[in-house]
Amino acid sequence: MGAPGLRAATAALGLLLCAGLGRAGPAGSGGHGAPGQLLDDDAQRPCPAACHCLGDLLDCSRRRLVRLPDPLPAWVTRLDLSHNRLSFIQTSSLSHLQSLQEVKLNNNELETIPNLGSISANIRQLSLAGNAIDKILPEQLEAFQSLETLDLSNNNISELRTAFPPLQLKYLYINNNRVSSMEPGYFDNLASTLLVLKLNRNRISAIPPKMFKLPQLQHLELNRNKIKNVDGLTFQGLGALKSLKMQRNGVTKLMDGAFWGLSNMEVLQLDHNNLTEITKGWLYGLLMLRELHLSQNAINRISPDAWEFCQKLSELDLTFNHLSRLDDSSFLGLSLLNALHIGNNKVSYIADCAFRGLTSLKTLDLRNNEISWTIEDMSGAFSGLDRLRQLILQGNRIRSITKKAFAGLDTLEHLDLSGNAIMSLQSNAFSQMKKLQQLHLNTSSLLCDCQLRWLPQWVAENNFQSFVNASCAHPQLLKGRSIFTVSPDGFVCDDFPKPQITVQPETQSAIKGSDVSFTCSAASSSDSPMTFAWKKDNEALQDAEMENYAHLRAQGGELMEYTTILRLRNVEFTSEGKYQCVISNHFGSSYSVKAKLTINMLPSFTKTPMDLTIRAGAMARLECAAVGHPAPQIAWQKDGGTDFPAARERRMHVMPEDDVFFIVDVKIEDIGVYSCTAQNSAGSVSANATLTVLETPSFLRPLLDRTVTKGETAVLQCIAGGSPPPRLNWTKDDSPLVVTERHFFAAGNQLLIIVDSDVSDAGKYTCEMSNTLGTERGNVRLSVIPTPTCDSPHMTAPSLDGDGWATVGVVIIAVVCCVVGTSLVWVVIIYHTRRRNEDCSITNTDETNLPADIPSYLSSQGTLADRQDGYISSESGSHHQFVTSSGGGFFLPQHDGAGTCHFDDSSEADVEAASDPFLCPFVGSTGPVYLQGNLYSPDPFEVYLPGCSSDPRTALMDHCESSYVKQDRFSCARPSEEPCERSLKSIPWPHSRKLTDSTYPPNEGHTVQTLCLNKSSVDFSTGPEPGSATSSNSFMGTFGKPLRRPHLDAFSSSAQPPDCQPRPCHGKSLSSPELDSESEENDKERTDFREENHRCTYQQIFHTYRTPDCQPCDSDT
């Protein structure tokens, strides 16, 4: 019953009571009581004539009173003076009402809070709503010490400035005023008691920070204000708040942490605002939230992690918003949600797993959306809703229902499909819902063909007839008839008015910026207008460029075929996705397969590696990054391969997610070209960067002092390392080196060769190497000792004077017979000419005698590099020297694959020269190589020559000192029963004409004799036996200067050793196979065999050319 009815009943009851009591009167009174007075059974309880009395309530409302009735009964506990014209209160009229606790002065003409006098301290509830109060003054309220409820609604209060006095107030209502500003701390004196605060329908536009320090407040209402933004921590201090209502404020922005501190709040109502997005930022801290009402907003997006802090939510209202899609993360984390209301949105897309996490959901309201495509074409949209009881899908423009549309809804009890013009339902579309109790379906558009025959029987079996109103629209004979009135035989399939897809769109790949088209066709027997649509990733394409065609196609009757072409211009990466065509008419829609479009773009570099020069030991950093679609893979190569020295040593680092390639502790072997390759399915691009490593100069080998005999060749080594390769300069005794015709530099000044050394050459030689990083110096001391005396004058090399140099020749003393106990050393000094002998794979030059090159150029790291011929500048500055070899002799190749290269000094550089494949093209190791030159260093060098045979065979040649031909004898030990044959076969004799014709004229010969000795006759390690005379001679080349012509009589004759007696040589011809092949061409060549005391002499003619004045001479040594 309403308030007016209650008041009427109360008044009627009061009149009856007054009339009855007035007639009865007290016993013996003899008359009536005072008119207008109410008396109870125990005593008289007077009630003013203008009021109504009911229990402890005195109701004087709606009497147009301008002053209080007088007198008021003292028993009044509740006094209602609302809806009068009171403008002031007479305190004297209330002073005797000591029991008064509740006063209602609503809708009067009061302009201030009235003073009720002494009884104010007893008042618990004071209602002053609907007056003209414009201020709340603390002094006006101080007397109400027991006040618990104060209603100041519907007044003219415009500001809340002066703080409330300390009261026991629990309920404060200041609704529908003109409050536009509030002072922080205004309610602080009510902090311990206030439970409910209502500030609805005011003009509040902002809430000041720390406005509400009310730890006991449970309910706060701010509806219908003008709050547009809510800053973070706005409601801090309301730790006990249970509900907050901010409806109809026009809120557009909720900052992060807007509701932080409301950890106990359970209900939040934000309906009728302008929020556009739900994010976890403004929901932060709402850990106990149970209900969230967001209807009538403009929400169009739910961020993936929005519900991270609201996982206890049980009811969510999102009705009347702008949601168009529900993604698989839209409700992630809401496992306790019981009711979800998304009605009256624009939802057209529901992801397959959109509801999968809602395991407790019981009610899902999706009414008045556009999810027809989700129901018609997708399966599993409602999977995961294991406890769903009610599903409302009315008004969603659903036209057909597939068999899998409601997969997973096994517990559904209520399904509402009303308001949809459903045309077809696949067989057993509802069969999996075993607990279904209500199915609401009303449609008049059904296609009553053979595929719908199951529906009437199933509805009847489940007693759903009262909820289903369905009639046929096709065929024409059944149009308008209820499906329950059509016999099963009436559902036939004579045609197919619903479109049937005949041409499916095809999956494609395209380059960014190109044009793409998809084609789709469908056929139908109906002439109903056809509509075409395209979807991308299950969402309708708006404003798509389409071309639509229609034509007749005969196939057992007249059929119409419809074709739609989707054209995509200048495709971008955002164009990627799955495209599907939807062709519809009045009878339903058909959906094509989904064709995938992939957009590719050739990679392009955003960071290109740059050339880098860095010191050894530092860290190299190369950057490389590329973009493309799909994202390109970055790969690195070094010098075209994947062999990284830094990788083997675990000094290389490539971060998969980084753009930087690191090499720590850079070394010389890291030098090279590094290639960065970016590759994807569209192609690949590469960029190169050169890494240069700088290293300070250093000595790769220790500097060794040298001791040579006067007249010998001295070779000083300074093998330099560094990057860039250092420049070398030699000084002698801390002074610039005076370069003479006897000084030669080789291998980039790493070798200093002094020919025909003299005592004046002795001293301290300093090698200074320098590059851009620094300078390094080292000293070598050269000692020159006088020439040792020899037993035979024939062993002494003829002297050379400076005027006789035509070719820089080297005459080396060999076969020195010294005191018993001194070692016998076979030493060969060989300086080869610059003309390359073709049998050693060296190109011959024409007639000009130039110095030969060092066999292999030594790089700064001491490794063998390519040959470099030509002139180089000496470090002294102005003087130029030709790069020459420390060995000047010929190398005699052995064509059966065995051979050895010998040199004329004891330097390691000569040993390295032996490994040059251009000079010694054989296979194997050399064995010991004996170097002549230093009489005090007879030790052999064990050298492996990659191109030489493993059979150590020595080619010994005589040095020609004058223009004659002399006959030399070469001795070899007799190792077996056939020494001559084996020794002669072991000597690598050259092709006689090929070797000699390149240097000497064919009209002169040279005889060589070989002695075959007993095995004990020669010992390389212990020296000669007494009485054994041997010679070690070499056939020398030139350095480009003419030799002085020596005296002919110096070698005119030679003595036969006393122990050389004729011995039989088994009658075998021991000449070289090559010499045999040349015997017919050169009849001057002859072989002479003699055997003397187990020694054989092999004599062969060499045609040699030294100078035009050379005379042939036959000499026996």
Swiss-Prot record:
Annotated keywords: Cell membrane, Cytoplasmic vesicle, Developmental protein, Disulfide bond, Glycoprotein, Immunoglobulin domain, Leucine-rich repeat, Membrane, Repeat, Signal, Transmembrane, Transmembrane helix
Q: Which domain of life is it from?
A: Eukaryota
* Region listing for Disordered, in residue ranges: 1019-1093
Task: Extract one GO BP annotation from the record.
Answer: otolith morphogenesis
Whether Signal counts among this entry's keywords is yes
InterPro entries to which the protein is assigned, alphabetical: Cys-rich_flank_reg_C, Ig-like_dom, Ig-like_dom_sf, Ig-like_fold, Ig_I-set, Ig_sub, Ig_sub2, Leu-rich_rpt
Q: Which parts form a coiled-coil structure per UniProt?
A: none
Write out the ranges of the repeats annotated as LRR: 75-98, 99-120, 122-143, 146-168, 169-189, 193-214, 216-237, 240-261, 264-285, 288-309, 312-333, 336-357, 360-382, 387-408, 411-432
**Can you list the disulfide-bonded cysteine pairs?**
520-581, 624-676, 718-767
What's this chain's function? Plays a role in craniofacial and inner ear morphogenesis during embryonic development. Acts within the otic vesicle epithelium to control formation of the lateral semicircular canal in the inner ear, possibly by restricting the expression of NTN1.
Subunit notes for this chain? Interacts with EGFR, ERBB2 and ERBB4 (in vitro).
The identity of this protein, by name, is: Leucine-rich repeats and immunoglobulin-like domains protein 3
Q: What is the lineage of its organism?
A: Eukaryota, Metazoa, Chordata, Craniata, Vertebrata
What's the encoding gene here? Answer: Lrig3
